[in-house]
Amino acid sequence: MVTVEDIRRAQRAEGPATVMAIGTATPPNCVDQSTYPDYYFRITNSEHKAELKEKFKRMCDKSMIKKRYMYLTEEILKENPQVCEYMAPSLDARQDMVVVEVPKLGKEAATKAIKEWGQPKSKITHLVFCTTSGVDMPGADYQLTKLLGLRPSVKRLMMYQQGCFAGGTVLRLAKDLAENNKGARVLVVCSEITAVTFRGPSDTHLDSLVGQALFGDGAAAIIVGSDPIPEVEKPLFELVSAAQTILPDSDGAIDGHLREVGLTFHLLKDVPGLISKNIEKSLAEAFQPLGISDWNSLFWIAHPGGPAILDQVELKLGLKEEKLRATRHVLSEYGNMSSACVLFILDEMRKKSAADGLKTTGEGLEWGVLFGFGPGLTVETVVLHSLST
């Protein structure tokens, strides 16, 4: 007689979840950060706000961003003037854009990941889709299933409105799905488009202006599975453990609210301080089982919320400058793409590690950490084990 325990054992994978492939995509429209303040104040009819424009220029200069990619072109904004105003009712116009474009950009990234994985897409058993750009029913997960031609029986999970920590969340979920379902191959997609947050400047809402200086569009996709097929699947990283926590005394530090005017963004000044003050506790809890306490012995992937967060984390933990190289590179080339950022950094790291002839995907090191930071303040901590390049 077969018992429930027998069935349970048979359902479980043997090895840890691994990242088997990564793909990324951006809209074609590239925006130069050095000329963006002029463009932004012109397109939003705000050129008379000279003092505010100077303030915005300083924000852009300090952002450490060289360029960003944006679905919103000048043509689209001219056709939708309400999106350019500060706090004008515009949710319908924004929704009409993102419900189409978010799955489309996700498809581009997913197609690249599936190609690298090298297996037929019919072998994808689960889909996790994550976006903070718009909400719809059926969701972007359903739309992507149709766009990619996945099996109708693919098991879908749609994550809306999680914000910047969610790149860590999707890895945590994919790990659990892969390890508890033998043979599972999980397609994870994060797709973000700033059409929900773009708006004109205001003297009274400077945190909104911070978002206008930092946010960019991008999608990233990964394939996660346990027990890779030898000679067929080439794992890049193992997902060793994953944790989530809400930081103490951080209520209201980062908020986003979906309103008639789109997604509004609110930020307290001390977000970098709150994160840097608490990050060592998360690291200690994650790496204590491995007996690791030298944070410079790890490879690092941290959500680049902004340069101040990275600077303070570096300072607090005494990290060498090169530790956040991959993170800073992605911030500089793409801006803050919310949930997609950490997956872009994972991709950048494994590619540069191979190009530099290093022995592992994690800059030649064995163990690494991936951090997601976002509304809550919520922190996701993922322990990674690199594999040979």
UniProtKB/Swiss-Prot annotation:
InterPro entries: Chalcone/stilbene_synt_C (IPR012328), Chalcone/stilbene_synt_N (IPR001099), Chalcone/stilbene_synthase_AS (IPR018088), Polyketide_synthase_type-III (IPR011141), Thiolase-like (IPR016039)
Residues the record marks as active site: C164
Catalytic activity: (E)-4-coumaroyl-CoA + 3 malonyl-CoA + 3 H(+) = 2',4,4',6'-tetrahydroxychalcone + 3 CO2 + 4 CoA
Annotated pathway: Secondary metabolite biosynthesis; flavonoid biosynthesis
Domain of life: Eukaryota
Gene3D superfamilies: 3.40.47.10
Enzyme class at the top of the EC tree: transferase
Function: The primary product of this enzyme is 4,2',4',6'-tetrahydroxychalcone (also termed naringenin-chalcone or chalcone) which can under specific conditions spontaneously isomerize into naringenin.
Record-stated family: Belongs to the thiolase-like superfamily. Chalcone/stilbene synthases family.
Protein name (record): Chalcone synthase 1
Organism annotation: Camellia sinensis (Tea plant)
